[in-house]
Swiss-Prot record:
It is found in: Cell inner membrane. Belongs to the UbiA prenyltransferase family. Protoheme IX farnesyltransferase subfamily. It catalyses: heme b + (2E,6E)-farnesyl diphosphate + H2O = Fe(II)-heme o + diphosphate. The gene is cyoE. This is Protoheme IX farnesyltransferase. It comes from the Bacteria. InterPro entries: Protohaem_IX_farnesylTrfase (IPR006369), UbiA_prenyltransferase (IPR000537), UbiA_prenylTrfase_CS (IPR030470), UbiA_sf (IPR044878). One of its GO terms (cellular component) is plasma membrane.
Length: 299
């Protein structure tokens, strides 16, 4: 198999290498990073930090994604959702993908160290290692709580963006991390229910596989309730205003509607519907934070 992968890897195109970075996921991460940057300052963000800081974070995120492709290539080949990925089909060789990941990581770290600050750079590296090594290499195969524990690495981008501008940690960016951290389990568990048979075939201990769908649906509902509460905290600590509060309540209410429908089996395809809405939810919630920051309303 290794020989086959190496041989067929010669057929790789630039699109295959782009796919290794999981660009859709990285774009969503960069949106939260971008919002973190702008929330860190009302005076504006220096263009060098805005451009090269986000580029550095994006390159490191892409590096982590490429490592994920390498480690999961045999699992990916067993699942319909992932079997067309470059390494699963053998279009890119594992060593080539690892070299690509290393190049992205080095370039990303160089940009962060040059144009932002050491704290932002090292936190980004910690996030990269947390996802690529701790989650992908160990937690994903070890425990049904893989998403909960490993979600911290994926929740880091708004913190990274904030620190890239401010150069220091504070309560506000940690709250942004908490929002993404709490959002992660219902987001991924909804997909895991939809793809339960594939995860079981690949022997990945996702919660629906190990504990059943009813248990997972209950926990999706509970986490969604917790998420709704957590998203009210920016208003409670005067980090945001009434505009954000209204958006958080409306968006959270809709998320709760999907979670309840999934729990009660009252909608066809509720699992994938919940998953898709969760993506829109996070995007719109962070946009609401940003708009509220620059267009505050008073009651």
């Amino acid at each position: 198999m290794a020989t086959l992968l190496a041989t067929r890897g010669n057929r790789a195109t630039w699109r295959d290498y782009l796919e290794l970075t999981k660009p859709k996921v990285v774009v969503l991460m960069l949106i939260t990073s971008l919002v973190g940057m702008f929330l860190a300052s009302r005076a504006g963000v220096p263009w060098t930090v805005l451009l090269f800081g986000n580029l550095g974070i994006g390159l490191c995120a892409g590096a982590a994604a490429a490592v994920n492709h390498v480690v999961d290539r045999r699992i990916d080949a067993l699942m319909a959702r992932t079997r067309r990925r470059p390494l699963a089909e053998g279009r890119v060789a594992p060593l080539a993908a690892l070299g690509f990941a290393l190049a992205l990581a080095v370039a990303g770290m160089a940009l962060l160290l040059t144009f932002t600050n050491p704290l932002a750079a090292w936190l980004t590296l910690a996030s990269l290692l947390g996802y690529a090594v701790l989650y992908t290499g160990f937690l994903k195969r070890a425990t049904p709580q893989n998403i909960v524990i490993g979600g911290l690495a994926g929740a880091a981008p708004p913190l990274l963006g904030w620190v890239a501008v401010s150069g220091q940690l504070s309560a506000e960016p940690l709250l942004l991390v908490l929002i993404v951290f709490t959002w992660t389990p219902p987001h991924f568990w909804a997909l895991a229910i939809h793809r339960k048979a594939e995860y079981a075939k690949a022997e990945i201990p996702m919660l629906p596989v190990t504990h059943g769908e009813a248990y997972t649906k209950l926990h999706i509902l509970l986490y969604t309730l917790a998420l709704l509460a957590v998203t009210l905290l920016p208003y409670a600590i005067h980090m945001s205003g009434p505009l954000y509060l209204l958006c958080a309540l409306l968006l959270g209410g809709r998320f709760l509607h999907w979670a309840w429908a999934l729990y009660k089996d009252s909608k066809p395809h509720a699992a994938i519907g919940t998953f898709k809405y969760s993506i829109r939810y996070l995007f719109l919630l962070f946009i609401a934070l940003l708009v509220d920051h620059y267009l505050p309303l008073t009651l």
